[in-house]
Amino acid sequence: MAPEKSLERATFGAGCFWGVEEAFRRVPGVVETAVGFMGGTVENPTYPEVCTGRTGHAEVVQVTYDPGTVSYRALLDTFWDAHDPTTPNRQGPDIGTQYRSVIFVHTPEQEAEARASKEEMDQSGKFRRPIVTAIEPAGTFWRAEEYHQQYFAKRGGGQCRTVW
């Protein structure tokens, strides 16, 4: 594993975080994932609070990765492949603002790459509808309860829709 100082962080919201986390865990160069919440107004929200839709948070996966092994662009490709970025506030049967498609950027370089990648995906013809993914500055990451961490690895994936 690379020394910690050379690792970088990326944060993505793409629907139910259980399946999205598993998609990123499969990427070589990803050294750690954690699921949680970002983008809301309540400090240290719980899963039940976020599910009300009143906190403003999105379910997210925070990815720690070795940029010498995997590029941020490759992580963006995984993000686009893991969900339908054309549906606002919904992924499959999961409906609510917590399931929105969002890229939380940690650096100006990530923002530039995310915007370029979104434009390329929008122009690619892969999707019949426009991409609604938001690109926002990363805020505080609130780690979800432990039973949500690596949920698929612990329990299997029958409860969550993912596209991978």
Swiss-Prot record:
It is an enzyme of class 1 (oxidoreductase). It holds the Pfam family PMSR. It catalyses: L-methionyl-[protein] + [thioredoxin]-disulfide + H2O = L-methionyl-(S)-S-oxide-[protein] + [thioredoxin]-dithiol; [thioredoxin]-disulfide + L-methionine + H2O = L-methionine (S)-S-oxide + [thioredoxin]-dithiol. The keyword Oxidoreductase applies. Transmembrane segments: none annotated. Gene3D superfamilies: Peptide methionine sulphoxide reductase MsrA. One of its GO terms (biological process) is protein modification process. HAMAP family: MsrA. This is Peptide methionine sulfoxide reductase MsrA. It comes from Methanoculleus marisnigri (strain ATCC 35101 / DSM 1498 / JR1).
